[in-house]
Amino acid sequence: MQGKKQRITQLTELLDEAARVYEQEDREIMSNFEYDKLYDELKKLEEETGIVLAGSPTRKVGYEILSELPKERHESAMLSLDKTKEVPALIDWLGNKEGILSWKMDGLTIVLTYRNGELVKAVTRGNGEVGEVVTNNAKVFKNLPLTIPYEGELIIRGEAVIRYSDFEMINAQIPDADAKYKNPRNLCSGSVRQLNNAITAKRNVNFFAFALIRMDEMNRFKTMMEQFNWLKELGFDVVEEKLVTAENMAETMEYFESHIITNDFPSDGLVLFFNDIAYGESLGRTSKFPRNGIAFKWRDEIKETTLQEIEWSASRTGLINPVAIFEPVELEGTTVSRASLHNISIMEGLELGLGDKVTVYKANMIIPQIADNLTRSGHLPIPKTCPVCGGDTMIKQDSDVKSLYCMNPECLAKKIKSFTHFVSRDAMNIEGLSEATIEKLIAKGLIKELADIFHVKDFKEEITTMEGFGEKSFRNLVDSVEKARTPILAKFIYSLGIANVGLANAKLICKEFGYDFNKVSNATVDELTQIPQIGYVIAEAFVSYFQKPENKLIIEDLLKEITFEKEEAAGGSEKLKGLTFVITGSVEHFTNRNEVKDVIEQHGGKVTGSVTAKTNYLINNDNTSSSSKNKKARELGIPVITEEEFIQLLNEA
């Protein structure tokens, strides 16, 4: 059954991606014949197993916008579990019984109801007594079965979560640092409680079952492990669980602890239940907690240190956050010397003063925080001027939280987005200048305009004393800046951040005008719209950018720092026109995979990120690899060639 469930998941994702690309990008990644073949295979597997996942093309759920989320009272209150931070306490609690130890996932708890094999209701935990009905949203969870091979009524609980990888991908699409989601749990909560489930569908919410609440034959299973295995057979993903006794508890705890950092999903500790269902239920409950389970949170390692200064960090929206700088301490295996205080309210509540003795820890073993101020010498002054631009500041209050803002609309901190884009890999490719580093350089007043980046070598003392920098990293940064002084024209144009002008469009425009900057910068809308793939909107934005006086000054300063790498006016040959390549693995003859990509595009070819029926060649020096791309290429009969074979192909074309 598990093999079939995995194949159902694989087919659902593959067909969904094919439909998305066709509908949103007007291109095909598989032929109609291939699509129909895979569709028929999926439909047959769904009929055999009774499992239909959310997103299945055989049962597409229509999107719907609601005016509100109805509230519903739970049949029985959902109590929290009692907690401990001590492994010996877990062992004592379990005694001589068997237990089920599993992750306490950090998302949003959902109660699902199925009748006659169909998902009919989903309700959030809410306050434990009343939750919100989110059935429409649950129907677009990435891995949730809409139908199951069970005809009676089934009620289960589980956790809706957003994986770290999806969280980072979603945040990467949000340019404003302060608009980014703080953690996967907050993003998940907002996603599950959307009024428009089309938004939920884009968030890749996953559901992991952790409890069977009710079914028609409740006496069918004697242990929780049997319940978990049965839920897996029905098509549910279940929280990872381990059978434990007092003897193997410590060893099992070490297993879970070692996986915290590598897990792709957020967790907030562990939960332990008695495996024997009847025994656990016989224990009853207190007024606050059920007695059949207990939660575990790892004890935070707390260290005492001395507060050295408060750094005021300005951001793109004008928000100025206080950051505590203290004497370095070792926490959870890493050296920590700073922690965000988040806002004025927290800073005032801690009554911080320079030289105070403070205790610090890592929340969830990851994020440094100040736990307490042991000496409380008094409030630090709140700056009346912005540390970046010198403009006036203002304290704004939202509910009970006070935050500091710069009121200058021209504050340099708000330019971080353009700086970050300018140095990115596909633009000027300056390594060592992350957004965080750029923010520090701006905050210290070391860079004000884009051209200032080319003079960071003048600030060795200031930069080498910054956290994360030393002599070596400073030299690497300077070397990277110097290499960036000879860009190709297309990457320079892209680095300017012109609206709607990506690297591919920049290459088309530069090629059209013979890689001549003067011609490119003076192009007209009529000239640009003659280029295939350049429409009126892009052309107008392009021309408008170069006509603005402030942009002319920026470019004038930049041109004093760089010399364009000479390119052939012909822009390469058309040897590879009509051919699509995918590049994977390490390269030997080229500097990196991007260089291979540039060569292919210079000769009229196209490079994509995934192997599809439209791919002509997969370039991989290890053509015997069992990687997913190699497997896919073999399945589709696509040649897998080495770099040398690619070079030979290019020379012979």
From Swiss-Prot:
Zn(2+) binds at C386, C389, C406, C411. It comes from the Bacteria. CDD domains: BRCT_DNA_ligase_like (cd17748). Coiled coil: none annotated. This is DNA ligase. It comes from Lachnoclostridium phytofermentans (strain ATCC 700394 / DSM 18823 / ISDg) (Clostridium phytofermentans). One of its GO terms (molecular function) is DNA binding. DNA ligase that catalyzes the formation of phosphodiester linkages between 5'-phosphoryl and 3'-hydroxyl groups in double-stranded DNA using NAD as a coenzyme and as the energy source for the reaction. It is essential for DNA replication and repair of damaged DNA. GO terms for biological process: DNA repair; DNA replication. Keywords: DNA damage, DNA repair, DNA replication, Ligase, Magnesium, Manganese, Metal-binding, NAD, Zinc. Residues 571-653 form the BRCT domain.
